[in-house]
Amino acid sequence: MSRIQPVRLPEPDQPLSGKEVIAILRERWSASYDLQLLQRNGRMYLQVMWAYLEQQTFPLSEADYRLGIERVVRAVNAMGQANMVRRWLRTSRD
């Protein structure tokens, strides 16, 4: 008699938090890079910007930077893309 292997269903997206995203950015690239969501031709893109919080010429205060990251994170969570973004931030070769 053959054994039936259980099917592993994908886990629902656990929401991202601003703190988690900032921690991933710092761990991955050793800097708190800014993020932006961009819509082009009906598609959404998450961009890691060249500017980062620790840079002397960074135009935002730390509080404003964190608010901006939280805005991006809320949008990503609302689209149900938390796991995809989490995985991309951790594994991207860019």
Segments from the language model and where they lie:
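N-terminal organelle-targeting presequences
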Residues: 1-94
